[in-house]
Design a protein with these regions (language model features):
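RNA-contacting regions in translation and RNA-metabolism proteins
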Residues: 1-222
């Protein structure tokens, strides 16, 4: 049986070894064992999202444009990935290609569902309390010499954290259940893989929203 050694502690009773079969690192090591191109660095694993014993998604990319990262990991007639599935007692495996374009990566991560569009949501600006202006009089103003200068204050732009990144994914109505997955698993794993909060909408709902928006715009112009 294959296990991942997650931690080793030394105490007075001797070393304690903690092992896991649910850690994503175990899946990574199994791919390194079964896929020579991963072990030699030609193909790299960008991220893994896993619900151990049920399903996992693995994002891979290639440093060689002539090497297909997904096909390489799947292997001839699926032999490589099947060996990993067998080791993990039938855990389903989705291997998707990682690309720098986040929209395409999200679409890949939702495989096997078809994606029509990915709309990124702007993060809400942080709410800051306005400071009350202090009443100043001429007596409170002090003069400074021309030779002294105050450093200019620069406000840093707020950093968008992973938790704030979100998008709406539009899929054909017939693909909605497939995109979401059983008990939401496909969407959940895709969100963890891409580090985006994903809201999946059917195309018909988005069209209705657009029609309503156009009607409201026409009414306001009249």
């Amino acid at each position: 049986i294959q296990v991942y050694v997650s931690k080793v502690n030394d105490d007075r009773h001797g070393p304690q070894i903690f092992v896991s079969r649910t850690a994503p690192e175990l899946l990574k090591r199994l791919f390194e064992r079964e896929v020579p191109e991963i072990k030699d660095g030609t193909v790299l694993i960008e991220n893994i999202a896993r619900e151990a014993g049920d399903r996992a998604k693995v994002a891979v990319y290639s440093n060689d444009p002539n090497v297909d990262p997904v096909g390489t990991c799947v292997g001839p007639r699926g032999s490589r990935v099947q060996a990993i599935v067998n080791e993990l007692d039938g855990e389903n495996m989705d291997i998707v290609e990682y690309v720098k374009d986040p929209a395409q990566f999200i679409a890949n991560a939702l495989n096997p569902a078809e994606v029509l569009d990915v709309i990124f949501n702007e993060p809400e600006a942080p709410v800051t309390e306005e400071q009350p202006e202090e009443n100043s009089t001429d007596d409170s103003v002090t003069e400074t010499s021309d030779t002294s200068t105050e450093p200019e204050s620069t406000e840093e732009e707020p950093v968008v954290t992973t938790e704030e990144r979100s998008c709406t994914v539009v899929v054909p109505d017939s693909q909605l259940s497939l995109a979401i997955g059983k008990r939401g698993q496909n969407a959940r794993l895709a969100a963890r893989l891409t580090k985006y909060k994903i809201d999946i909408k059917p195309a018909s709902e988005m069209e209705d929203n657009n029609d309503t928006l156009e009607e409201e715009t026409d009414a306001s112009e009249d």
